[in-house]
UniProtKB/Swiss-Prot annotation:
GO molecular function, one term: 15-cis-phytoene synthase activity
Name of the protein this chain belongs to: Phytoene synthase 2, chloroplastic
Family: Belongs to the phytoene/squalene synthase family.
Catalyzed reactions per annotation: 2 (2E,6E,10E)-geranylgeranyl diphosphate = 15-cis-phytoene + 2 diphosphate
Cross-referenced Gene3D superfamilies: Farnesyl Diphosphate Synthase
Transit peptide: 1-25
Principal place of residence: plastid
Keywords: Carotenoid biosynthesis, Chloroplast, Isoprene biosynthesis, Plastid, Transferase, Transit peptide
Originating species: Solanum lycopersicum
Enzyme Commission designation: 2.5.1.32
Amino acid sequence: DPDIVLPGNLGLLSEAYDRCGEVCAEYAKTFYLGTMLMTPDRRRAIWAIYVWCRRTDELVDGPNASHITPQALDRWEARLEDIFNGRPFDMLDAALSDTVSRFPVDIQPFRDMVEGMRMDLWKSRYNNFDELYLYCYYVAGTVGLMSVPIMGIAPESKATTESVYNAALALGIANQLTNILRDVGEDARRGRVYLPQDELAQAGLSDEDIFAGKVTDKWRIFMKKQIQRARKFFDEAEKGVTELSSASRWPVLASLLLYRKILDEIEANDYNNFTRRAYVSKPKKLLTLPIAYARSLVPPKSTSCPLAKT
């Protein structure tokens, strides 16, 4: 019976989860802080998902990225199927394998993320926001969809499951747009421009301006619009947070508010995201936690919004 877990396996599994936590603490400090507010079983599950996403991203962005082939991504996707079928390849896979056996996680967003990495292999420009949105869905909207089954929807929520997933999707998109706006200079040095080409052109800008890395009035006007759009996605996401199970509202709101603050920091840097990397200081991060906690106490709406589909 595969459900009989031997004590030795239990020890290895708990070690596997701890290792996932360490990876998370090392590479995603803000995100890690958010996970510390979760219930232990949820925290471990989110760590396992984070580590898989991180390793997937490393295939395209990591030290060996220049050697990666579409075939390697196919192998990675086959390995994903094995994880979901209870056949993990290594320790970190084992943590995710355990997570997907405990929570009703769907494989599709994971497959979609691999698809995003395939896109990243050949695409380094985005003609318009529709193209960029699709990329953001693949690499980050998927993370929102992966997380909902872990976070759980409040039993008393009257919202449709679809609306909660849409809010989670919006949060993933908002986070990725924020990453893109924070990392413009860094990406340009890798020959990549994750900004809509048509909107750059409308602002009288081109790739050359980005590679030159000079903050001009044109750039400030362009950036204001991009930041405004990212904030809209955060606002959209915030509407769904109240529908999550009570224990999950605080960590998700904290992550949302912390990430949204990066946009404030880009503004504080006078839109210089070429040579400065906007980040939120530790005191600001800690101040955000009680604010998020207070907001997290708001229960799900007792009746669904009058405009919502019933």
